[in-house]
């Protein structure tokens, strides 16, 4: 606010609380905290605040002060006005609605005008039960002059309305500025939501979910349906969000509406109604920025209140039609062959896309994080041991699971955890609208870039080795391709599922899977060779190698490059194989392979199975112990790797995992490289 706007009679906002700070002072308000620096600023503000009542002009406040102190007062008042902490004139709000006016004064320069707009708004309340009744009272007491309560399901004979009337247009007042829906059933809320959206009327939902009440606004950019679908991604027991063929809004509401809320007592009902009423006030008056894409959760037993942000969900009535879809869906060309111009545009955009800034990944990824409504619930160290490696975990939604990342620093570990989380989520985020009639999506042959249909069950498989999220498209595809090569190399050489536990018995026991040396000839790489490869790989690999030496881990590295001739090394501890890594060069496998060995040892020594690596087929005991040390395999180009796969009947296809456009916008390079066996 310009200085001249408050020079008349400055008044400090009623929600401002002054507290000292080591470097000056803080003013804590409903809108956040404002900081003022300076050795004496807290003393100045403390002395000045009692006089900023809106009754005295700046000239009157400074008339008896020396010029230097008068100038300081004017500068402080100007700073307060510029930050919206001081209003121009008038006493603090008072009267029967001083609470509402006081709240609005925190967000509006003219709280009275905002409150008048609120009073003039028509509000319809849909629902029955104790919470609906209490909320109706709260809204009337807050100053709303036009609140109508609709009790669906009571029947016309009792003066009510029949189920389904809202969707028929008989219930919804087209003049309403807001509909408030109170229910225990998300399916009922969805029916109300869609009816209101069709009529262009915003709706505030209060939906009970177990021992919680979730409240949020839907309309315009905001979508309660999106928020609820995000919530359901964390709660496998959440009620399905699908309305019946003939929505019976009243039946669900009248039957048990808010009985659960009432069971927690009258005080809980009162708090829940007050919360919903406050959000109505904030929405109608635009008192708070950022209510879009948020839901507020009231935990009914404890009355703890938290606000959660969500990204728009791709499966909702508000989701836009995808720009790129597989032809062969309804209205397309049968056969599931992708539209060539659209496919070419899509692939070109991925290839030409800017790499994700690693330093900015923390800020960009924050939009995906929320404990209840996020794509990722948390990224943290969870009390894991942080030596020798830093280990971070990310919780992933839809369905809930845990992924981890490790590295030499906490930031590096978190980056890898976020990438793993995005890959895992993207591999389960399937939009039915983007499948063709046969349930397929579009992939791209790595051999020639030609689009091919891929079964959705194959493309969206979070356990597949080729599921990767990277910082750029080329890197993600390459990582997915090489992970498939490692799986093929180890898997194709696997003999029986397990070794017999008892000599002379042909029944396989539950022991580890062993590789058949007839198909794979492990060649031992001595420490000197490993050191040379690590030096070629870079500082990270060398650091891992030094850690293994300090910990006296009996590292074993074998060249297991098979018929594909893609450099593949097996990394282990003694006779135990920990993992297989393929690369374009043998040196390219060292960083991931040595990190896997360290992670295995850290998990084992600290008894922390969360980040333990999955079992892999085992090399035979003392593999490659004879014949001397081997030279590392020859390097290959990516084109040679693809050609080798095709020559052996393995056709690699890259499928972009981009069905959630919000996640794709933040981290666009998630892919599953699948192998089509011809």
What spans do the regions from the language model cover?
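Long, low-complexity, charged/polar intrinsically disordered regions in eukaryotic proteins
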Residues: 1-33
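A short, well-structured beta->alpha microelement
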Residues: 140-176
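Helix-biased "structured C-terminal domain" signature
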Residues: 287-504, 514-678
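E1/E1-like adenylate-forming module used to activate ubiquitin-like modifiers
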Residues: 162-165, 175-274, 285, 301
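Long, charge-rich, low-complexity alpha-helical segments
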Residues: 31-147, 523, 531
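Hydrophobic structural packing positions in well-ordered secondary structure
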Residues: 61, 139, 196, 277-280, ...
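Structural motif
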Residues: 125-134, 151-154, 180-186, 206-209
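Short, hydrophobic alpha-helical segments
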Residues: 52, 81, 269, 273-289, ...
């Amino acid at each position: 606010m310009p200085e001249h706007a408050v020079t008349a009679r400055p008044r400090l906002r009623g929600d401002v609380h002054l507290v000292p700070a080591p470097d000056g002072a803080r003013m804590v308000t409903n809108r956040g905290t404002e900081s003022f620096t300076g050795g004496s600023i807290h003393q100045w503000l403390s002395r000045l605040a009692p006089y900023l009542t809106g009754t005295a002009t700046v000239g009157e406040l400074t008339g008896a002060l020396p010029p230097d102190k008068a100038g300081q007062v004017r500068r402080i008042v100007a700073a307060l006005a510029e930050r919206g902490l001081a209003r121009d004139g008038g006493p603090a709000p008072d009267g029967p609605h001083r609470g509402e006016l006081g709240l609005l004064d925190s967000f509006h320069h003219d709280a009275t005008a905002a409150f008048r707009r609120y009073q003039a708004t028509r509000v319809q309340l849909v629902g029955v039960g104790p919470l609906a009744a209490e909320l109706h009272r709260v809204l009337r007491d807050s100053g709303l002059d036009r609140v109508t309560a609709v009790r669906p399901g009571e029947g016309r004979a009792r003066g009510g309305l029949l189920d389904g009337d809202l969707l028929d247009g008989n219930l919804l007042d087209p003049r309403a500025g807001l509909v408030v829906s109170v229910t225990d059933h998300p399916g009922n809320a969805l029916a109300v939501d869609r009816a209101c959206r069709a009529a262009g009327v915003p709706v505030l939902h209060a939906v009970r979910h177990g021992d919680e009440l979730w409240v949020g606004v839907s309309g315009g950019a905001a979508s309660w349906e999106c928020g609820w679908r995000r919530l359901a991604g964390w709660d496998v027991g959440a009620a399905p969000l699908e309305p019946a063929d003939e929505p019976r809004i009243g039946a669900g509401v009248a039957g048990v509406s808010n009985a659960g809320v009432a069971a927690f007592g009258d005080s809980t009902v009162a708090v829940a109604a007050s919360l919903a009423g406050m959000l109505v006030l904030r929405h109608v008056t635009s008192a708070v920025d950022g209510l879009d894409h948020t839901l507020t959760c009231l935990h009914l037993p404890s009355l703890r209140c938290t606000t959660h942000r969500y990204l728009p969900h791709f499966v909702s009535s508000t989701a836009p039609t995808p720009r790129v879809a597989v032809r062969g869906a309804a209205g397309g060309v049968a056969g599931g062959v992708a539209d060539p111009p659209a496919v070419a545009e899509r692939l070109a955009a991925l290839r030409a896309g800017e790499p994700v800034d690693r330093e900015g990944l923390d800020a960009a990824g924050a939009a995906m994080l929320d404990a209840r409504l996020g794509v990722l619930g948390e990224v943290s160290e969870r009390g894991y041991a942080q030596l020798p490696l830093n280990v971070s975990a990310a919780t992933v939604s839809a369905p809930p699971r845990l992924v981890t990342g490790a590295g030499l620093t906490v930031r590096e570990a978190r980056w890898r955890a976020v990438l793993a989380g995005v890959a895992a989520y993207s591999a389960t985020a399937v939009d039915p609208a983007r499948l063709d009639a046969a349930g397929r999506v579009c992939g791209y042959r790595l051999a020639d870039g030609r689009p091919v249909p891929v079964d959705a069950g194959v493309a969206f498989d979070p356990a597949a080795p080729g599921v990767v999220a990277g910082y750029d498209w080329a890197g993600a595809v390459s990582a997915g391709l090489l992970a498939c090569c490692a799986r093929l190399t180890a898997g194709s050489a696997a003999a029986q599922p397990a070794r017999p536990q008892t000599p002379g018995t042909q029944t396989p026991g539950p022991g580890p899977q062993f590789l058949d040396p007839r198909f794979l000839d492990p060649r031992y790489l001595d420490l000197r060779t490993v050191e040379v490869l690590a030096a070629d790989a870079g500082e990270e690999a060398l650091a891992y190698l030094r850690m293994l030496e300090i910990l006296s881990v009996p590292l074993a590295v074998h060249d297991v490059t098979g018929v594909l001739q893609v450099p593949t090394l097996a990394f282990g501890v003694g006779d135990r194989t920990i993992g297989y890594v393929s690369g374009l060069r043998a040196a390219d496998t060292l960083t991931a392979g040595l990190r896997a060995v360290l992670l295995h040892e850290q998990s084992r020594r600290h008894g922390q199975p969360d980040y333990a690596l999955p079992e892999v087929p085992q090399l035979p005991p003392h593999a490659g112990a004879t014949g001397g040390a081997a030279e590392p395999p020859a390097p290959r180009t990516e084109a040679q790797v693809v050609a080798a796969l095709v020559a052996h009947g393995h056709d690699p296809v890259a499928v972009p995992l981009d069905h959630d456009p919000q996640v794709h916008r933040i981290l666009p390079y998630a892919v599953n490289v699948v192998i089509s066996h011809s």
